[in-house]
């Protein structure tokens, strides 16, 4: 349920109403817009006398929110959420380019790639330390050592870092990580999501390979319900009957998500296509669709990469892509 307050409602009136609602064991989320304030009510709202609430002097409108996701709902929070990560901003008209290798392989490799990422104009450095792989025999990442090397790369470039967590037991290792990524396979690992909700770190939440948009938003709700509203959604392709690409990039999800939620939406064309030659066109398409950012894989020697070399751009290709994205955004604005 949401209560839209009338323009000119004083802070004292708002505080009094919030206290009254909380006395009914409701969680109240306050969203200050340019003209009005919206109170989002979470809990057993059947106890609320809607007619009484509507009759209050400061209340303009009361509406029930029928969607199961509440805090992620644009009706609760009409203005776009802007998430700050270091000097980068994501959402609300701000665009982020996130780039880096699929896996951290060595200090020399990650620092070299990080320097190339920064030189290209990208905002954040991604890199895998813990790698969920389909095959148990594939490279699983460097683990804690990989995070240490990512921090070395951050020290060398000042780029904020993004890396994936796989289970709750390693959470302490992410204390100095700027953005924690939840991969597609863990999108519905609800225990993990709840623990991440207790942190104050931005969470990049990837859509599962066979999950609906509503399921993605409900996973975001798990994080937000624990107090962390710094959630970035990521479309990375879904599984369909098509085999020409690794996954099928659902670009319509960008527009649909923007209509349903205030959270930023980024797109990962590398995992969506699995082919480096397709990444630039899909990155541009995602930009045109209104994505708040792009996340691509980059390697200084893709042919020798320990994983996903086929979908990795070279630093020169990243430079060109970033230039094209910036030109496109200038036209779109």
Regions found by a protein language model. Give the residues of each.
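Glycine-enriched alpha-helix->loop->beta-strand junction motifs that scaffold or abut catalytic
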Residues: 121, 173-181, 197-203, 224-230, ...
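Hydrophobic faces of well-ordered beta-strands that scaffold small-molecule active sites
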Residues: 95-101, 125-127, 161-163, 180-182, ...
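Active-site mouth loops of central-metabolism enzymes
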Residues: 8, 95-112, 136-140, 160-164, ...
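Conserved anion-binding
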Residues: 129-133, 186-252
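Glycine-rich, proline-tolerant flexible connector loops at the mouths of alpha/beta enzymes
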Residues: 126-144, 299-312
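Active-site/ligand-binding-proximal alpha/beta "capping" segment
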Residues: 85, 224-286
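Alpha-helix-loop-beta-strand connector modules within alpha/beta enzyme cores
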Residues: 139-163, 195-202, 251-265, 311-333
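Non-catalytic terminal accessory/regulatory regions of metabolic enzymes
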Residues: 1-97
């Amino acid at each position: 349920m949401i209560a839209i307050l009338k323009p000119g409602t004083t802070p004292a009136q708002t505080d009094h109403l919030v206290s009254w609602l909380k006395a009914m064991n409701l969680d109240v989320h306050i969203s200050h817009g340019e003209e009005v304030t919206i109170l989002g009510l979470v809990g057993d709202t059947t106890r609320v006398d809607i007619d009484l609430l509507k009759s209050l002097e400061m209340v303009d409108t009361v509406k029930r929110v029928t969607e199961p996701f509440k805090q992620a709902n644009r009706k609760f929070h009409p203005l776009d959420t802007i998430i700050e990560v270091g000097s980068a901003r994501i959402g609300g008209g701000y665009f982020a380019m996130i780039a880096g290798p699929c896996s951290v392989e060595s200090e020399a490799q990650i620092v070299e790639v990080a320097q190339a990422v920064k030189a290209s104009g990208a905002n954040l450095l991604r890199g895998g330390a813990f790698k969920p792989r389909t095959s148990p025999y594939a490279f699983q990442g460097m683990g804690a050592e990989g995070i240490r090397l990512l921090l070395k790369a951050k020290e060398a470039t000042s780029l904020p870092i993004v890396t994936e967590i796989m289970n709750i037991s390693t959470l302490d290792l992410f204390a100095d990580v700027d953005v924690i990524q939840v991969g597609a396979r863990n999108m519905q690992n609800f225990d993990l999501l709840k623990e991440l909700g207790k942190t104050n770190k931005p969470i990049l939440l990837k859509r599962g390979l066979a999950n609906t948009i509503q399921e993605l938003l409900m996973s975001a709700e798990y994080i937000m319900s624990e107090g962390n509203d710094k959630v970035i959604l990521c479309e990375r392709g879904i599984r369909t009957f098509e085999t020409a690409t690794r996954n099928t990039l659902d670009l319509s999800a960008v527009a649909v998500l923007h209509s349903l939620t205030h959270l930023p939406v980024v797109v990962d064309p590398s995992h969506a296509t699995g082919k480096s030659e397709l990444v630039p066109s899909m990155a541009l398409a995602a930009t045109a669709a209104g994505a708040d950012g792009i996340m691509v894989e980059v390697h200084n020697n893709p042919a020798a990469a320990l994983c996903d070399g086929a979908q990795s751009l070279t630093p020169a290709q990243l430079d060109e892509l970033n230039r094209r994205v910036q030109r496109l955004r200038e036209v779109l604005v």
